[in-house]
Structures are given as structure tokens and as C-alpha cells.
Amino acid sequence: MAEMTVELVAVEQRLWSGSATLVSAQTTEGEIGIMPGHEPVLGQLIEGGTVSITPVDGERIVAAVHGGFLSVTATTVTILAESADMAQDIDVEAAKAVLAENSGDLEAIAVAKGQLRAVERA
């Protein structure tokens, strides 16, 4: 089966790197699915979105991302997020509390919604 190299990087750290058969991400142009051999593209990730990676040899990886970019070549996908949280590391109750308490903080709301969306997709 064809595969591609994928890197998921946030400003603070590299979250995941390896070979995958599918990447899907939410961009400002809509949700995009990328398989090996995809046409080159550069996309802007939405605030409070998710990225899903299907590794060659493992369970699907899901992360909540808050802004950033997605760069695709025929053999490589690089996801550069302003911030990101792996779904398994997200505190669901804390994210729900942010939604309940921060009705005026749009950035905090977007991050919390993205975190909950990532947990649902994982």
C-alpha cells in the first residue's frame, strides 16, 4: 500500500511524525482528505479544527489544532499548527468548563470546541 511521510508540529513541540496512508484536516476551504500522491496544496487550518492521521501500522491519531497551515507534496504532509492537543491528552471536563464559563472569549471557545471535536473523532 502506498504511504506518505507526515509531520504534525505545534509551535511548542513535534506531536507526531511517521508514515501514513490518509490525513484529513479542516481548512478554511473545507475538510480535505489527503492520500499518497495527492496534488501539492497549501491550506490554512481553521481555528478550533481537527486533524486525523491514519498511520501505516497503528490506530488513527486525532489532534485538536488551533490555526496554522497544511503543506502537501506528492510524498509528504506537514501540519504546522499554532497550538495542538492530541485527543488522548485532552481533559474533556476542563474543555466543557471553558465553554460554560467563557461566553465572551471567542479564542478560548474555539480551542475548547476543537478539543471536544477531536475527542469525538478519536
From Swiss-Prot:
Pfam families hit by this protein: ATP-synt_DE_N (PF02823)
Annotated Gene Ontology cellular component terms: plasma membrane; proton-transporting ATP synthase complex
UniProt GO molecular function: ATP binding; proton-transporting ATP synthase activity, rotational mechanism
Membrane topology: Peripheral membrane protein
Transport recorded as keyword: yes
Domain of life: Bacteria
Family recorded in the similarity comment: Belongs to the ATPase epsilon chain family.
Oligomer and partners: F-type ATPases have 2 components, CF(1) - the catalytic core - and CF(0) - the membrane proton channel. CF(1) has five subunits: alpha(3), beta(3), gamma(1), delta(1), epsilon(1). CF(0) has three main subunits: a, b and c.
Protein name (Swiss-Prot/TrEMBL): ATP synthase epsilon chain
Species, as recorded: Rhodococcus erythropolis (strain PR4 / NBRC 100887)
Gene: atpC
